[in-house]
């Protein structure tokens, strides 16, 4: 399943994305019929995928989940640095594809501008190709899967499951406080928007956490406290693993 005849994708998008794209990539909603542009995009990705495999060893895959403001992105950077992981973000990969100006990127941008959802298959293909082109033996996938539809698509397309799922468990009031601390705009509007994001996260992402908990793959990290305190727990966990 781990084909190498694919175009290289940037693991970390280095150009400055627009604030609109960074903050308004739509959340996945299950059972939404894909538009015509999505169908064309699926065909483009499928037609350019390599066929067959070369027997490459599957990397150690860790999903990193947590609500907005839980600090998972910050912790991922430190995990990647200290333990030799490639750090992949689905949002960054979509933005990177858009920034190329190629046909696939333009189609993704049009879907987002229309307020529609980029199909799970597209996001998974970007992740799969990034894993293959990185040649990394250990991969962190940050903030994905965001819903059960994402999870099912990942397992179907890659033919594998994650080896580990890290869930940064953070109380809602703490996440709200952190997110408000990042913003300088109208506080009332920010609170309303943040609480909506948290409700969407709970309804879509928690079932994924529950599923992998039933598979014995989830390690919960208490995401309250300082960055150093949280990383202390993270470091202890990763130091105990055998890759």
UniProtKB/Swiss-Prot annotation:
Biological-process GO terms, alphabetical: 'de novo' pyrimidine nucleobase biosynthetic process; CDP biosynthetic process; UDP biosynthetic process
Entry's localization field: Cytoplasm; Nucleus
First-tier enzyme category under EC: transferase
Pfam families (alphabetical): ADK (PF00406)
Main localization of the protein described in the UniProt heading: cytoplasm
Sample GO molecular function, one term: (d)CMP kinase activity
E.C. code: 2.7.4.14
Binding-site residues for ATP, renumbered to this chain: 69-74, 182
Cofactor(s) required for function per UniProt: Mg(2+)
Disulphide bridges: none
Region named LID: 181-189
Cofactor binding mode and count: Binds 1 Mg(2+) ion per monomer.
Catalysed reactions, semicolon-separated: UMP + ATP = UDP + ADP; CMP + ATP = CDP + ADP; dCMP + ATP = dCDP + ADP
InterPro entries: Adenylat/UMP-CMP_kin, Adenylat_kinase_CS, P-loop_NTPase, UMP_CMP_kinase
A GO cellular component annotation in the UniProt record: cytoplasm
Protein keywords: ATP-binding, Cytoplasm, Kinase, Nucleotide-binding, Nucleus, Pyrimidine biosynthesis, Transferase
Domain observations: Consists of three domains, a large central CORE domain and two small peripheral domains, NMPbind and LID, which undergo movements during catalysis. The LID domain closes over the site of phosphoryl transfer upon ATP binding. Assembling and dissambling the active center during each catalytic cycle provides an effective means to prevent ATP hydrolysis.
Summary of the function given for this chain in its UniProt record: Catalyzes the phosphorylation of pyrimidine nucleoside monophosphates at the expense of ATP. Plays an important role in de novo pyrimidine nucleotide biosynthesis. Has preference for UMP and CMP as phosphate acceptors.
PANTHER family linked to this entry: NUCLEOTIDE KINASE
Subunit structure: Monomer.
Protein family membership: Belongs to the adenylate kinase family. UMP-CMP kinase subfamily.
Protein name: UMP-CMP kinase 2
Source organism per UniProt: Oryza sativa subsp. japonica
Lineage of the organism: Eukaryota, Viridiplantae, Streptophyta, Embryophyta, Tracheophyta
